[in-house]
A protein has these predicted regions:
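Amphipathic alpha-helical dimerization/coiled-coil segments
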Residues: 1-20, 89-110
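N-terminal helix-turn-helix DNA-binding core of bacterial DNA-binding proteins
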Residues: 19-60, 79-91
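Alpha-helical residues within the helix-turn-helix
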Residues: 52, 69-70
Length: 110
């Protein structure tokens, strides 16, 4: 494998957002979080519905949703029928998808 010669931009790796980015990767290191992020990429769902989708108890699902909400990855919309969750933007979903595609590619190369 040949390495590309790349001109590094200092701001890309010396950023005040580095710790927050590492926090996002820490959340993505949890399979439950990745399942949830992938499940709500295109829809907003209640904690009960999401628990059914990811096959977890509602209390565990709610706990994980709170962690994702605290990190700013998901947001909660309060409605008369209850709370609904959705991704804040596409970035976390894109990271989770990229990780899955990377893992699939690595598996195919073996």
């Amino acid at each position: 494998m040949t390495m590309k010669k790349v001109e590094h931009v200092h701001a890309t790796y010396d950023t005040p957002h580095l710790n927050a980015a590492v926090g996002v990767f820490a959340l993505l290191a949890n399979p439950v979080s990745v399942k949830m992020i992938l499940a709500i990429r295109d829809i907003e769902v209640s904690a009960n519905h999401l628990a059914d989708i990811v096959d977890l108890p509602v209390d565990q699902t709610s706990h994980e949703l709170h962690r994702l909400e605290s990190a700013g990855i998901v947001s909660r919309q309060r409605r008369e029928s209850g709370d609904f969750y959705l991704l804040n933007g596409v970035h976390a979903g894109a990271l989770a998808e990229a990780a899955i595609f990377h893992a699939e590619h690595q598996q195919q190369e073996r």
